[in-house]
UniProtKB/Swiss-Prot annotation:
Complexes and interactors: Monomer.
Cell compartment(s), UniProt: Cytoplasm
EC category name: hydrolase
A GO molecular-function annotation: tRNA binding
Name by which UniProt lists this protein: Peptidyl-tRNA hydrolase
Reactions this protein catalyses: an N-acyl-L-alpha-aminoacyl-tRNA + H2O = an N-acyl-L-amino acid + a tRNA + H(+)
Compositionally biased tracts (Basic and acidic residues): 189-206
Residues forming the catalytic site: H19
Role noted for this protein: Hydrolyzes ribosome-free peptidyl-tRNAs (with 1 or more amino acids incorporated), which drop off the ribosome during protein synthesis, or as a result of ribosome stalling.
Main location: cytoplasm
Gene: pth
Residues annotated for tRNA binding in this entry: Y14, F64, N66
Length: 206
């Protein structure tokens, strides 16, 4: 079993937030492979199935972002998997420009609170993660308002291609292993278009 966890917050109000890009990526993976999130386990919505002959579980923790580790540890124990080789976590990363997707086989949380929780409760940093760049907030914005804000129009136009790249990265992890997948995924970050540079980040949530 290979477990792919997308991080986010449950509930309609958070559905299209930047912070929920992990949820959005695993939802696209499920759609592409005709899997349904009709299971529930360890405070997570679960979709299971075969992808290219390999058993896969997709998870969207329902614990809220900052407590993601509680759900992930429960799932790791339930499926009896080795995090170092059978776990991939997908999440938003402020330190990567929007449009950048990076795959790593281990490392720190980079300050992302969901990852903080997972690392703390798993007791290890040795598991794969797919970092989906959302960029830094515009001047004058609080970080919390930016990550809990919805994508702006220019970002929404680009997202389908980025979701495709994220799903393809997950598929490469399954077919080739994380180390080989890293070589294919970690190319140069795409340049920001003029439209994206000018587009406002949307009004801050109140």
């Amino acid at each position: 079993m290979f477990l792919i966890v997308g991080l986010g917050n449950p509930g309609e109000k958070y559905l299209n937030n930047r912070h929920n890009v992990g949820f959005q990526c695993v939802a696209e993976f499920a759609r592409r492979h005709h899997l349904s999130f009709d299971g529930k386990r360890s405070d997570a919505r679960i979709a299971e199935g075969l992808v290219n002959g390999q058993r896969v579980a997709l998870a969207r923790p329902q614990t809220f972002m900052n407590d993601s580790g509680k759900s992930v540890v429960g799932l790791v124990n339930w499926y009896k998997i080795d995090p170092a080789s059978e776990l991939l976590v997908v999440y938003d990363d402020l330190d990567l420009p929007f449009g950048t997707i990076k795959l790593r086989n281990q490392g720190s949380s980079g300050g992302q609170r969901g990852m903080n929780s997972i690392i703390q409760l798993l007791g290890t940093q040795k598991f794969a993660r797919l970092r989906f760049g959302i960029g830094r907030p515009p001047e004058g914005w609080e970080v919390i308002n930016f990550v809990l804000g919805n994508w702006n129009a220019a970002e929404r136009e680009t997202l389908p291609k980025l979701y495709d790249r994220a799903v393809e990265a997950c598929e490469l992890c399954l077919s080739d292993g994380v180390t080989k997948a890293m070589n294919a995924v970690n190319g140069e970050a795409p340049k920001k278009s003029k439209d994206q540079a000018k587009e406002p980040a949307n009004e801050q949530p109140r």
